[in-house]
A protein has these predicted regions:
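N-terminal alpha-helical targeting/anchoring segments
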Residues: 1-134, 149, 153
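TRNA-recognition modules of translation machinery and tRNA-sensing kinases, especially anticodon-binding
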Residues: 27, 130-429
Length: 429
């Protein structure tokens, strides 16, 4: 959410930003917001004047009564009563105007960074850099669920009976590998100075609207019936929410946290669910990282965060590349975002395994995450988030890139302590 003062003083900048995101239907919102803001300020000014007059009238009324000027006193009292009725009406209008203003402000997208490429969809995202040499083996790489099934490691049919499409049972060595990757990612981030945290897996609606746009909320979040609670789509939601309505000392920044959680997503929208496979599903587990920092440090942390993911994947011998997300591919709260994609030997192309985002002060403004400096000046923090690792997408990349010609899967050295020293997984069938 933008600062209303910024919108008031820079309406053309806001309009051009909307055009750059190809959201022209939102252009009328700018004039609507400016009109509501003007009316809101007019109301406040009139209420302030009426309150001052009321205070003055109260003193005059007492003085007139003391002087025996009862007729004048009653006339003044009647006038003041009319002013009080006006204040009551204005207060009700003010409440409605502020609610309408906030609702419209939350729909206007954040101002994207000037470095973001302008594009209409994710096909116009721009490759930034490749890490590791993509390998195409001289044998056929099976579909990822076929690899898992060769280890008796996945049961989609039973999961479908129990919960419907978009769920799975992982078993045996595949389940063990899943846990090993999560544990390794946790320790990887701890060793890089991040504080480990296991957050709440449900959050209230005020936190939901604080961390994401209405469009994201509708497409992703599961609501608990009869409760003001939602299942988290990523632990970023509850981790950023941890700082709601806080004033943080500048000397304590940055806060760097890495968190584990299950994640729940409706996956409503253009992509939908895969009928076969575990690439896009309703439930998965993820290791996340978030940063709360000073505004001038957020771009530095942005680069550090996505590099952590690249380093993690490269430590497991998985080639990756980074893609700069274009303007239309950015969610409305994001200032800048990069996708990390892993190499798929089977498809002979890269696919998304994580995303790093700088949200500027958008989440901080919605949630009231403030910082107080040495001179007692208060300002909004900047927030960032990044995927450390998200099985089962990570498992797809891992299995394909470490698969051997005999059907076994090599375990990279960094994962062996988490797999009981196992050097390779041998198929059961």
């Amino acid at each position: 959410m933008l600062d209303i003062k910024f919108v008031r003083e820079n309406p053309d900048v806001v309009r051009q930003n909307i055009r750059n995101k190809f959201q022209d239907a939102k252009l009328p919102l700018v004039d609507e917001v400016i009109a509501l803001d003007l009316r809101n300020r007019e109301i406040k000014k009139e209420v302030e004047t009426l309150r001052a007059n009321h205070k003055k009238a109260s003193k005059q009324y007492g003085a007139l009564r003391a002087q025996g000027k009862l007729e004048e006193a009653e006339k003044l009292r009647a006038e003041d009563a009319a002013s009080e009725e006006r204040m009551t009406a204005l207060s009700a209008e003010e409440k409605q105007v502020e609610a309408d203003l906030k609702q419209k402000m939350m729909i206007i997208p954040n101002i994207i960074d000037p470095s973001v490429p302008i594009g209409k969809d994710d096909s116009e995202n721009v490759e930034v850099e490749r890490f590791g040499e993509p390998v195409v083996p001289d044998f056929e790489v099976p579909y990822h669920t076929d690899i898992m099934e060769s280890f008796n490691g996945i049961d989609l049919d039973s999961a479908r009976k129990v919960a419907g499409n978009g769920f799975y049972y992982l078993m045996g060595d595949i389940a063990r590998l899943h846990s090993a990757v999560i544990s390794y990612a946790r320790d990887f981030m701890i060793n890089r100075g991040f504080t480990y945290c296991v957050p709440p897996f449900m959050i209230r609606s005020d936190v939901v609207t604080g961390v994401m746009s209405f469009a994201e909320m509708d497409a992703m979040m599961y609501k608990i019936e009869g409760e003001d609670l939602y299942l988290i789509g990523t632990s970023e939601h509850s981790m950023i929410g941890k700082f709601i309505d806080t004033v943080n000392k500048e000397e304590n920044l940055p806060y760097t946290l890495t968190s584990y959680s299950p994640c729940f997503r409706k996956e409503k929208g253009a992509h939908g669910l895969e009928e076969r496979g575990v690439y896009r599903i309703h439930q998965f587990e993820k290791q996340e990282m978030i940063v709360i920092c000073k505004p001038e440090d957020s771009m530095m942390w942005y680069d550090k965060l996505w590099k952590n993911t690249v380093d993690l994947f490269r430590s497991m011998d998985i080639p990756v590349r980074t893609l700069e997300c274009c303007s239309c591919d950015l969610a409305d709260l994001k200032v800048k975002s990069v996708d990390v994609e892993a190499w798929s030997p089977r498809q002979k192309k890269y696919f998304e395994v994580g995303s790093c985002s700088n949200l500027g002060d958008a989440q901080a403004r919605r949630l009231g995450i403030r910082v107080v400096g040495p001179d007692k000046t208060k300002y909004l923090a900047h927030t960032l988030n990044n995927t450390v690792v998200a099985p089962p997408r990570m498992l797809i990349a891992f299995l394909e890139n470490n698969l051997q010609a005999d059907g076994s899967v090599r375990i990279p050295e960094v994962l062996r302590p988490y797999m009981g020293g196992m050097e390779k997984m041998v198929p059961k069938k």
